[in-house]
Every structure is written in C-alpha cells, then in structure tokens.
From Swiss-Prot:
Zn(2+) binds at residues 133, 136, 155, 158. Its EC number is 2.3.1.286. Its cofactor is Zn(2+). Belongs to the sirtuin family. Class U subfamily. SUPFAM superfamilies: DHS-like NAD/FAD-binding domain. Residues 1-245 form the Deacetylase sirtuin-type domain. It catalyses: N(6)-acetyl-L-lysyl-[protein] + NAD(+) + H2O = 2''-O-acetyl-ADP-D-ribose + nicotinamide + L-lysyl-[protein]. The lineage of its organism: Bacteria, Bacillati, Bacillota, Clostridia, Eubacteriales. Keywords: Cytoplasm, Metal-binding, NAD, Transferase, Zinc. This is NAD-dependent protein deacetylase. It comes from the Bacteria. NCBIfam families: PRK00481.1-1, PRK00481.1-3.
Amino acid sequence: MLLLDKINELKKIVAESSSIVFFGGAGVSTESNIPDFRSENGLYKTKNNFSYPPEVMLSHTFFKNHTEDFFEFYREKMIFKDAKPNAAHYSLAKIEEQGKLKAIVTQNIDGLHQLAGSKNVYELHGSIHRNYCMDCGKSFDLEYVIKSETTIPKCDKCGGIVKPDVVLYEEGLDDSIIQNSVKAISEADTLIVGGTSLVVYPAAGLIRYFKGNKLILINKSATAYDNEADLVISDSIGKVLETVI
C-alpha cells in the first residue's frame, strides 16, 4: 500500500472511531529536537563527556550513590527547557478537542502534550516539570531545579534533596497511572501507537490490553507488533498526524 493510501486509510479509521487512545514514545518528541534513546542519534549512541553510560546514570542506584553526577547529567541531557510542541502534539490535542481522542499514554517526560493543549495525559515515566523534596514532600517546578545554586537542588523549607518526579531504572511505575492507562487502552476502539520501538517494558506491555478494532503503528523503524497491526505507517509521526485533522 502506498503512503498516500495508508494516510487515507488512517483518516477513514479516525473518522469512524469514537474512542481513540494514543500511545507514544520518544519518537514523538524528536521533531521538537529532543533526542530519543536508541536511534543512531539517540542518547545511548552519541558520545558524552560523562564517565558512565547514560543507562547507568539514569538508575536509582546511581542517583543514590552519585547524586551530584546524576544532576549534572540530568540538567545537560534530559532537560530541554526551550523545546516546543510539534505537529504531532498539536494534532493529537485537536483530535482530543473533537471528542474522539480519549487519552494519551506517553513514555515521555517533557510535558509537550500538555503544552500543546492535551488534557487527558498519562505520563508513565513521570515529568521533568514535577519535582519534590525527598524529606518533606514539598513540590517544586522545573525552574527551581534549573536555577538551583548548588548542583544538587535542595528544598528551601527543610534542606532535603529535591528529586525530579521521573521514573529511573530500578524504580517502579506509578500504580494509578498504570491502572488509568490500562483502563483507557482496554476501552478504546482504536489504538494509535507512535514514535516508539515498543522495547521498553513494562510500558510496551500495555498494548496487550487493547481489545478494540484497529491497531495503528506509526514509527520510522519496524516494531515487534508490526505483524499484529491493522495499519503500519513508516514515516514522520508529525507529518502523518497532521494530515488527519
């Protein structure tokens, strides 16, 4: 099937759907100049000036034992303060506005879906925009972490370490986020999966809960679920979704 035919098929599916859920990964934000993890230009493949590989530095153990190094890496490689939503984010917000898109389940931590206007967003891996004191629980915004005078941001109330509300390796996902995501996916008539290679578990396993009619995959590279999908589009997610609205 030609790309144009696939896009027309996608338009038809969206038009006939009343309960769509979008499940997205890092590829959704690469068009906002936020690197993904596993592609050739991704965080895990590109050179950096740190002594440890990124997947080690993004672990709970590393955060606990090398807190200063963690924050140096986190500020430099995980925060993209000036990133703006792209065509994919805005298109999804529009489909939600039309009443068709019921939820976005995202593996991203950048908050760009909300910035584009999406309301019902489940952030599996947390958000850079939420930070909290590990001792007293006080909440802080991203600006507080960025502008901290010390490498390790400290609570202005009790002096405890302010930790980003992002899920590190070795940490579990939030139960309520998982439950809401499972509920949304299991009740959807159409599931659009975009910008993810579906290799990160337990997040990727959520697709198993889909019982609806149409599974659509939009990703530049192949995924393990391609054979199970009703429609596979190997192209830019922003370009594809923009044609639907």
